[in-house]
Amino acid sequence: MSKEIAKKRIEELRDLLNTFNYQYHVLDNPSVSDAEYDRNMQELIKLEAENPEFMSEDSPSVRVGGTVLDIFEKVTHKSPMLSLGNAFNEGDLRDFDRRVRQGIDGANVRYICELKIDGLAVSLHYEKGRFIQGATRGDGVTGEDITQNLKTIKAIPLRLNEEVTLEARGEAYMPKRSFVKLNEEKEQNGEDVFANPRNAAAGSIRQLDPKIAAKRNLSMFVYGLANVEEKTIPSHSESLDFLGELGFKTNPNRRTCETIEEVIAYVEEWQEKRPHLDYEIDGIVIKVDDVALQESLGTTAKSPRWAIAYKFPAEEVVTRLTGIELSVGRTGVVTPTAELEPVRVAGTIVRRASLHNEDLIREKDIRIGDYVVVKKAGDIIPEVVNVIFDKRTGEEEEYRMPTHCPACESELVRLEEEVALRCINPTCPAQIREGLIHFVSRNAMNIDGLGERVITQLFDADYIRTFADLYALTKEQLLQLERFGEKSATNLIQAIENSKENSLERLLFGLGIRHVGAKAARTFAEHFETMDELVKATEEELKAINEIGEKMAQSVVTYFDNEDVLELLQQFKEYGVNMKYKGIKIADLQNVESYFAGKTVVLTGKLEVMGRSEAKKKIEALGGKVTGSVSKSTDLVVAGEAAGSKLAQAEKHNVEVWNEERFLQELNK
């Protein structure tokens, strides 16, 4: 492989893995299987090792996790919640053992093996035995404050058996029986069901209303002690015993092993026992038990050297493929999906499986009526692995992708260097509908109450066809729709009205310009400050911006060189939709003498003008430090709407409190 090709492939893999990380760790909405993610990661690691000149500090191969959403308050972990390196077979486990023994110069080593619970990783903070704060893992450094929701989980003690100050870490999960019951209720109510227990747990814990989490019958296993004051515990196994004595729920199926052979035997044992548990596990975690040896081995930027996660092979089952259904995405890509005779895979009933594209169907010679092997290695629609040719009867039908769009009957095209067929009709109803769903999504205009179901209702009723149509909706129209009452209709109209005040970057991202993600949208918004200035920009001006490449620049210029788009922007203006950047430029804050220099600040509640992540960046650019909890060392609390318990903590510690208006005044000095 030439250096040029290697560089291009490395960049492609980084973009791909960053997208997968964001979908999995931030949105709780993964789009690929664990196996596919791992394949791409291993390819990237190999290419970077072979081409060290292309190594980058921000490569997915060396960093932890993704970005945190501006929904809950931010919490900075006192020590990073690192991810673990992976082992996929016995050889990987033996390599891990060899590295450990080399790193400790022949000292005796004992391992502790634990079941890897498939849930949501959280940290729990206790002061003098009282539960004061819980947070998600987030990107490993900064998580989200989910204290109130965690308090609804009965397995989490609100008061410990000793008045000790500590941070424990664990995995919140939904038992299988609770998952089945929840999905049955959602089906009866006509709601979308959860794909699996992990998604159900994550979705429940990240609800803004703790009452919803309380109804979901979640549980939790604590798997580690991050720190504890005035106490030294020499081994991980003893720390788990200590946590159990304090009142935490720890998993009883852990085992200490003196040799790697014992570790391998434990892995094989639980691979067999796995289906009989009432909770999902996706592997085994193996750790060096001795804490002193852990400290000696240390960590890499991404994971500890003293621990590894063995990942179970994807579960594979056989079922019959009864048909192939096509869907059209917002960019026009036509994706085939296999329709299957229902079969249980990895704890859920599966009726559909991804076929990705026409090339895959041809490569695997998939035909309607075939018996196929299906696997589900992660949290997504499963994939067809292969056909069982021995079961063919001769009655199976070969499948050919259509030449015309299934939604609008326009001719399909295959763009250069793409394997997917694409509908390029800008009036295709399927693309319009998917585009509307994207426009109102969390990272775009973030219109609460406008999800896929409601957008589909509005679209089918012919109430909306363009983004601007959303701002012409009336309460009377909503009341004509199923499951809308006076209150819900009023709330949705208000949510749509509120979205008019969003900063420019949200609108830009919502437009769905090809190649422009949320990060690029913010870059454009901060650089040009208004939509009008961006519309006038040339390709050369766009390419001159840091991190904006030729492909993206061309896409932006092409998008705005369209009369329909310009008409849409004019309609936005008429409806009063903001098209200016409301943020404060980071670059303008550098080297400025500021009140915030050397100050410790806590942000709480909803900030209307900027998200808390942006406020944090501004404070840090001015020399301040942002923390997630109020203490006697805190200098200032900035309180937005619906500020919670941190106000009481500020009063207790006699800390000054500002509202958002006062905060912005100080920033703008």
UniProtKB/Swiss-Prot annotation:
Q: Which reaction does it catalyse?
A: NAD(+) + (deoxyribonucleotide)n-3'-hydroxyl + 5'-phospho-(deoxyribonucleotide)m = (deoxyribonucleotide)n+m + AMP + beta-nicotinamide D-nucleotide
According to the UniProt entry, its GO molecular function terms are: DNA binding; DNA ligase (NAD+) activity; metal ion binding
The record's Gene Ontology cellular component field reads: cytosol
Q: Which CDD domains match?
A: BRCT_DNA_ligase_like, LIGANc
Can you give the residue ranges of the BRCT domain? Answer: 591-669
Q: What does this protein do?
A: DNA ligase that catalyzes the formation of phosphodiester linkages between 5'-phosphoryl and 3'-hydroxyl groups in double-stranded DNA using NAD as a coenzyme and as the energy source for the reaction. It is essential for DNA replication and repair of damaged DNA.
Name the family. Belongs to the NAD-dependent DNA ligase family. LigA subfamily.
Could you identify this protein by its name? DNA ligase
